[in-house]
Structure formats: structure tokens, C-alpha cells
Amino acid sequence: MNEKQKYTKWVACWGNAPSISDRELVTYAKDLNLRYPVRICFNGNKIRFHFSNITGQEAIKISAATVGMAIDDRSVDASTIKDITFGGCKSVVVEPGGQVISDEVNMELSRGDNVSVTIYLGEYTMMNSGVLITGPLSKGFFAYGDYSHERELPLNSTRSTNWFYFLDTIDIYTEDKNHALICYGDSITAQDWPDYLMLRTYEDGYDSVSVIRRAISGTRILREYDCITYAAYGAKGEKRFNRETDVAGAGAVIIQHGINDIIHPVGEEVNIFRPMSDLPTCQDMIDGVTDIYVKCARNKGLKVYSGTLLPIKGWRTYAA
């Protein structure tokens, strides 16, 4: 079997869950360059990119996007830089609520390689579809100016960021044995354990699995906020789960979700947006997990692993 024949399917090798970005005084950017280093977990010969404006209120234009082999976090081997195109075009407009998938990029990749994805937003762009995540494999950089085809971002005018805007998922065309594991949840999963799980699989020789993070801080299973104060806490599980588990090559999902349903309600006398009527019963939670998550996952052929809710004794709603 030659190299081309051994690659048979698309599998997600990196992913996040864009949501409503925090409401800051400035929600627009122009002439902005984003660069995201990404660890490759499979061998493959093609790569493609999903971009999302799922929570955007205005269309956004990606003026240019490129991928290249990373030298370090900020630098790319210029000889390897390739344009990411969309129907043959080097730019694309993503409508509010929309998503786009790039053309395939021919690129010989090996497990353990690092690539950098660079996105240039030349026009005024509403930065309202992104996610804040942390971990040793989750860092990005931004600078003003178009560096999409440049080797290095300028040291004195570049800042690091843990905000990942618009880039949703990266798929690689790889071997049939490979599959994706989805880690779904809230701020617990937006923190660093999925990155350490990915590193652990790499170090221990589990070379057929990728870890795809779908985490939005503050989200609940059964309810969502309709006020601007907590807009960034995102959609409830009923709206999220089916979309976020639509992952190429996925074989299983770890669900670590539900603690916010319990700890958010405090009573209107404390916080007008967090009435005690939002507090679910145990049966509400069981039904929510079963009906919204487990049934959906199994209909997609996914194995389901449920994380235990973390201890909350002493929390304000512990005995409610």
C-alpha cells in the first residue's frame, strides 16, 4: 500500500466551541492578525479548516488565512506557508450564524508536527464568535497588520492571547484506525485538562486518538441567560450538543457538564438574573443528561463517558 492509499478518511485533530465573546467596550477589530500554533496528532496528507461565526450578529470577512509548519510559537517556516482557500478564493465572508469549511490543503503531516494557522481580518470585524481556553497546547498571538505570509510576528507589537476567534475545527485526512474523542463541557473543560489528556496520550503511545475540546464557560444543560450581563455564558445544552458533537471521525464523548445548573441560582434578592426557580431537581438533571446528551450521542454512534460533578459542599446552593 502506498502512502496515498493508506489515508482513507477525515478525522478532526483540533477543535473548540466558539460562543458569544465577552462584552467589552471594544467589540470590533480591523487590520488584525491572529496566529494559532496547533499540535498535529496524526499522520496525514491533507488538512482542512472549519471557521464559525455561529454567535456573530454581523457577517465577518476573513481577508486571508494560511497554514505553515511552525518553527516556534510565533514563527513559521516561510517556505511551507500555504493559502487556505474557499472555493478557490483566498478570502471568504461568513454570515452571522454561519460556518464555512475550507478547500482541502495538500500537506504532508506527521504525528507530533506543529503547524501555525494565521488569520488576517482586514476589515472592521465584530469579534463576537470566540472562546477563552487555557492549557499548554492552547495559546495564540495577535498583532496589527497582515502577517499571513510572514515568517515571524514582530516581537514588540505582538501579544499572546487565550482567545480563539472564528477557528472552529481542523480535520486531517488520515488512516482508518484514527478517531476523535470529544471533551464536552463548561469552564472546567475550558481549562487545561483536555490539553494534558492530549499530551498524556502522546507520551504514552496512544497514537490513534485526538482530543477535541467543546467547552464554553458558564454554560448550563437546561437553561441559558437572555441578558447581556451573562450573554457570554452561551447557549444551553439543548442548543449546543448536537452541533458540537458533529465531529469528523468521532468515536466517543466525555461529558463534564451540569455543575452550573446547580451553583448559578442564588435568588433574585441577591442577583436579579439568577432566581432560585432556575434550580433544577435531581430528576431534571438526570432527564436532561439522558434526553439531550446520551440519546443524541448514541444516535451518532458515539460512546458516552460521563464525568462526575465536582464536590460543592459549602456552596451557597448546596442544601437548597
Descriptions of predicted regions:
Residues 1-184, 189-190, 203-206, 318:
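N-terminal secretory targeting modules
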Residues 28, 149, 223-224, 275-276:
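Generic signal for short, ordered secondary-structure residues
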Residues 161-254, 258-264:
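Conserved, compact domain cores that house catalytic/ligand-binding motifs in diverse enzymes
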Residues 52, 68, 217, 256, ...:
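Conserved residues at the C-terminal ends of beta-strands
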Residues 43-44, 65-68, 183, 194, ...:
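Small-side-chain structural scaffolding
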Residues 227-320:
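Alpha-helical cap/lid subdomain in secreted, periplasmic
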